[in-house]
Amino acid sequence: MNGSGSTAKESLFNPTPRKLGLPEDNTMTPYNGVRSIFDNSSGSRQLTDEHTNQERAISKAKLADENIAPFLAKHIPSQYAPLGADASKTTGPPRPMNSRYCYRHRPDLKCRRQADEPSMDHLQWELQSLSQSDQQGIAHVWSLFSAAPAKQRELMLRGILAQCCFPQLSLISSSVRDLIRIDFITALPPEISFKILSYLDTASLCRAAQVSRAWKCLADDDVVWHRMCEQHIHRKCTKCGWGLPLLERKRLRASKEQIEKRALGVSVAPDSSTIAVQTVDATSGVKRTAEDLEGSDSQVVKRQRLPTEDTELHRTNVRPWKDVYKDRFKVGTNWKYGRCSVKVFKGHTNGVMCLQFEDNILATGSYDMTIKIWDMETGEELRTLTGHTSGIRCLQFDDTKLISGSIDRTLKVWNWRTGECISTYTGHLGGIIGLHFENSVLASGSIDNTVKIWNFEDKSTFLLRGHSDWVNAVRVDSASRTVLSASDDCTVKLWDLDSKQCIRTFQGHVGQVQQVIPLPKEFEFEEDHDAGHEEDSNASVSGDESPLRQEPCSPGASFFEGDRPAPPRYILTSALDSTIRLWETYSGRCLRTFFGHLEGVWALSADTLRIVSGAEDRMVKIWDPRTGKCERTFTGHSGPVTCVGLGDSCFVTGSEDCEVRIHSFKN
């Protein structure tokens, strides 16, 4: 048994006594072995052989320990140093982290993978069923493998696998299948885990939160759900096609910088100079506090792993973004399936011609010459503004003032909180049937076919002439210093306030245009090429034949030179030809026509997710602005629907039947 004729594989897995550190024993020959088995002549001889075998096993174990101990002490001195460690080798600077090891086997870290208790119990039971010598041999093999460096481990494993039969390979395959499943979310730094989780959809995130407490902490974090809110709220997600109703934009803006810093692994230290911005969620009324980082030198500090008292207090006052998303998702689902509650406000004695609402305040104007202020939650009429001598056709209000326009040719400015009329403006030769203000610029449209611009800062005014019939609606865009106007002459015009000239005319309607509204900048149109070509050809027949219309142009290129902002890219118009049209202002093209109303469309309101229209046919329709599909139709008014208002979780309609209806999708 000197092993000279054995292969390398045999010498690896069938070591001779010399390879284990044992001297060759001439008594261990085949002859002696056979003689010890078949010679039963003396019982004392058998006892002597048993005693010799025990001594030999003990001697083998001692010699194996003497050979294995230096190997273990060399590779894992911190865990196994029975011979004593050299103090001179332990002094000095700490060794740098070795990146060649995986996170399970780094020498400077303990294994963070928990042992499988049932498997270890079964392994221990099987080991104890073996003889003492077999237990020692197996323990030595485990110790050698545990202490071996990575390359030697791989060599050992390849050799073991080469000796395995198919049943053993099957056992290895079934065992490895579970062992290689790594909890990467917990093992990775939080910043990388946030990045991974941010690619999941809502259903997958909710499932991830059920895996473990560590996963729940990461999957429910504001970093992940703030990004989810940005993807879906007030816009259609390009991945899933879902869009959720708008909530206060301040909340997204104020929290965005803090959330982004947390996602990168840093946090913003609270500063006494920061301004706290509090907003109220439209669905539940729970306040969410966010720090406004503008104008403050916020100190960026290293991220704290343990929450402090300040952060805990902040968390108790801040509503999690997951809850915000959940509420918005419920509202969005109600919008999709038409689940809503209806409130009817009665108080006007003539047709309701205009309305606007903000938060829970609703203002309505009527042909009965009054403006009424309502509490939308309770339905209570807060006050009535009187002073006009004819029907009120248009109004708009903000936090401090309300401006109304009437057939009596006047504009009135009100303190709507007290009911006081602050001032009255005259200048039109006919009744005022449309108005809109933004910042310090007010535009009004009149029966006298003109648009008048009022500047509150320098008190200047001027007229825009070009329409040949009543101007029914106007919209100011103060950023680009432009105004849109819709008229009974079947056209829509875009005006430059600096040059006081019309820079584009949109033609295509065959009935009087009643409304024009710009779509938010966040709106992105997905053009259907077949439908788009059809709309282009139809619009070009009756549209403006100027070169500006036919040439494709980049945003703002055909309007202004330099860095001046361009006007809104997309606008919506409605007319008494029973249609709604979507236009691109840069090219002048009509991108889509919405068909469905049976009679003229009087009222129009829209955001990035939907369009609401009211018509002479007494119906209110909800449209998808991207596809042109009518998603739902609401009835209930007994007269033409003359005005509509759209919010994140409700829409309001007014009619010539003197009623105001609120459709709420909150519950």
Curated annotation (Swiss-Prot):
Q: What are the start and end residues of each WD repeat?
A: 347-386, 388-426, 428-464, 466-507, 549-593, 594-633, 636-667
List, for all copies, the residue spans of the domain called F-box: 182-228
The coiled-coil segments of this chain are: none
The record's listing under SMART domains reads: FBOX, WD40
- Superkingdom, according to UniProt? Eukaryota
TM ranges are none
Instruction: Describe which pathway this protein belongs to, using the record's wording.
Output: Protein modification; protein ubiquitination
**Segment Disordered: which positions?**
1-55, 528-562
One Pfam family, please name it: WD40
Keywords for the protein's UniProt record, in alphabetical order: Repeat, Transcription, Transcription regulation, Ubl conjugation pathway, WD repeat
Please give a single GO biological process term from the UniProt record: protein ubiquitination
Alphabetized PROSITE patterns for the sequence: FBOX (PS50181), WD_REPEATS_1 (PS00678), WD_REPEATS_2 (PS50082), WD_REPEATS_REGION (PS50294)
Q: How does it assemble?
A: Component of the SCF(sconB) E3 ubiquitin ligase complex.
Query: Per its database record, what is this protein's job?
Result: Component of the SCF(sconB) E3 ubiquitin ligase complex involved in the regulation of sulfur metabolite repression, probably by mediating the inactivation or degradation of the metR transcription factor.
Entry's family note: Belongs to the WD repeat MET30/SCONB/SCON-2 family.
Q: What is this protein called?
A: Probable E3 ubiquitin ligase complex SCF subunit sconB
